[in-house]
Amino acid sequence: MSFCVNPNCPHPKNPNNVQVCQACGNSLRLNGRYQTLGLLGKGGFGATFAAADVALPGTPICVVKQLRPQTDDPNVFRMAKELFEREAQTLGRVGNHPQVPRLLDYFEDDHQFYLVQEYVKGHNLHQEVKKNGTFTEGSVKQFLTEILPILDYIHSQKVIHRDIKPANLIRRQTDQKLVLIDFGAVKNQIDSVLSSNTSAQTALTAFAVGTAGFAPPEQMAMRPVYASDIYATGVTCLYLLTGKTPKEIDCNSQTGEMDWEKHVTVSSKFAEVIRKMLELSVRHRYKSAQQVLDALEMPTYEDGMMQGMVSTPFTTLTGAGDEPATGIRMGNSSSPDYGDPSTRFNTNVQPRDPSSTSLNTGIKTRTAKPRQSPRDRATSNIESPTTRVRPASNMADGGSVGAGGIDYNMVNPKPFSRREEEKQAIANQPETKRWNGKTFLAEYAQGKRDFADQNLVGIVLAKAFVPGINCYQANLTNANFEQAELTRADFGKARLKNVIFKGANLSDAYFGYADLRGADLRGANLNGVNFKYANLQGANFSGADLGSAKVSPEQLKLAKTNWRTVMPGSGRRR
């Protein structure tokens, strides 16, 4: 079926074999390449469609967001266009993160604007709770360790999402990771001060203020800050714990705060974390995602392989000493849908196994059978002197780890030495295509950019021109990228031990959570590179330009620098 995007079309559904709507004569192929297949969601200011990109082999599915201001007022149209261009610029900037949909295209057609994004198959957290029941305390902590690094990344790009809610968090079916969607309400901190017309700027901002109940007071007053996303994340935690929307939770008549604590039973320490996330006053709320993670005193989802970040030798993690949760009171899992169901298809979801395993980190993870999930792999190497299985909670449909029809199995291997751990990590890699420099460059020349999770050990790409490659979580141990062009490359969570980046152009590359032990970055261009939480122990930055790189002094203490190294923020050599 083809679907007409004309908002005034009386019969938008059309057969597959036509290119012009039979009812209104409107073209069914946007920009000459996107064949619209169906409506995913709509609102007063636009609609979202599923489409097939007929210009690419295999006609891959994508998401087309239409912004359709129905007005003759040139000022309103101009503001709508600014909103469209703002979202396009933001998506282009933050879409480099593997858990944010990539922007594929954007264009204007007949006074309507279109954004084309990567299609993410899976269920959102709102659907997950409605189908499978509420989360345990441990599962909500796991959620926080995954969503907070995403927020930390988009905030580092000077972007406030402004619409964090369960409906905008999809658990990707292919790997069970959360993907943050719908940047339609973003507030670009850089561009927000460029408009001299205050009334027009206010009207433009008012188009997309967020979702009532999830947006904090300062955001409703058109003055969002980074901590506004922290508040919305806290409200999302409440929904995961209770199944209740903010409208279903009473407010204190004197303070205006949500009276949520009577609806849940969690440890006092975790309750304090949520309480501070939900502070109405920005002054008393957590200011950043990292502050929340520090308060949780538990490793992030990605930290299983990043324990070498500390200056001490590799050791088994110890527990955080959290009080155990005593249970979760069930909320109404059939609460009405408050969010836009826009960018996803329906997919089958396996029933949830409500059992959970308590590790000595204080994290309780939900488990199912028979394969181990990526979420569980992040914590499976943590030594646990005793493993307790929590009794099944009284959930509406049983429990599950996530959507997508993938089963799981929790394993508890013995702790490894560092060398054994590295060997085991390579042995546990899924079977993937065997790569060498020739096959890699051939695939790149044909348009391939996604090399995530691939086994690229020892690959030689010296002097290669491969900007924009995605090597997220790939194994690149002993690879050679000397003098390569790697602008905007994504090496997030990649294994990069002893990799040669000597003289390479790595400007605006992402190395979040990567293992760069012993890597050679001498003379490399590292302007705008993000090394957040990367392990730089023994990495050589002699003569490298770190002037605008995001890296902490603590990380650099573990690395090698010399007098020719341009240090962060200084603009001058050491």
From Swiss-Prot:
Q: Which GO terms describe its molecular function?
A: ATP binding; protein serine kinase activity; protein serine/threonine kinase activity
Q: How is it modified after translation?
A: Autophosphorylated.
Residue ranges under compositional bias (Polar residues)? 343-364
Q: Which reaction does it catalyse?
A: L-seryl-[protein] + ATP = O-phospho-L-seryl-[protein] + ADP + H(+); L-threonyl-[protein] + ATP = O-phospho-L-threonyl-[protein] + ADP + H(+)
Keyword ATP-binding listed? The answer is yes
- Spell out the residue ranges making up region: Disordered: 319-407
Q: Which residues belong to any copy of the Pentapeptide repeat domain?
A: 454-493, 504-543
Q: Which PROSITE patterns match?
A: PROTEIN_KINASE_ATP (PS00107), PROTEIN_KINASE_DOM (PS50011)
Q: Could you tell me the EC number(s) of this protein? A: 2.7.11.1
Pfam families for this protein: Pentapeptide (PF00805), Pkinase (PF00069)
Identify the residues that bind ATP: 40-48, 65
Q: Per the database record, which ranges form the Protein kinase domain?
A: 34-301
Cite the Gene3D superfamilies for this sequence: E3 ubiquitin-protein ligase SopA, Transferase(Phosphotransferase) domain 1
Locate the active site. Answer: 163 (proton acceptor)
Q: Which InterPro entries does this entry report, sorted A to Z?
A: 5peptide_repeat, Kinase-like_dom_sf, Prot_kinase_dom, Protein_kinase_ATP_BS, Ser/Thr_kinase_SpkB
Keywords in alphabetical order: ATP-binding, Kinase, Nucleotide-binding, Phosphoprotein, Repeat, Serine/threonine-protein kinase, Transferase
Role summary: Protein kinase required for cell motility, but not for phototaxis.
**UniProt similarity note:** Belongs to the protein kinase superfamily. Ser/Thr protein kinase family.
PANTHER family this protein is in?
Answer: SERINE/THREONINE PROTEIN KINASE (PTHR24363), SERINE_THREONINE KINASE LIKE DOMAIN CONTAINING 1 (PTHR24363:SF0)
- Kindly provide the name given to this protein in its UniProt entry: Serine/threonine-protein kinase B
Question: What is the species of this protein?
Answer: Synechocystis sp. (strain ATCC 27184 / PCC 6803 / Kazusa)
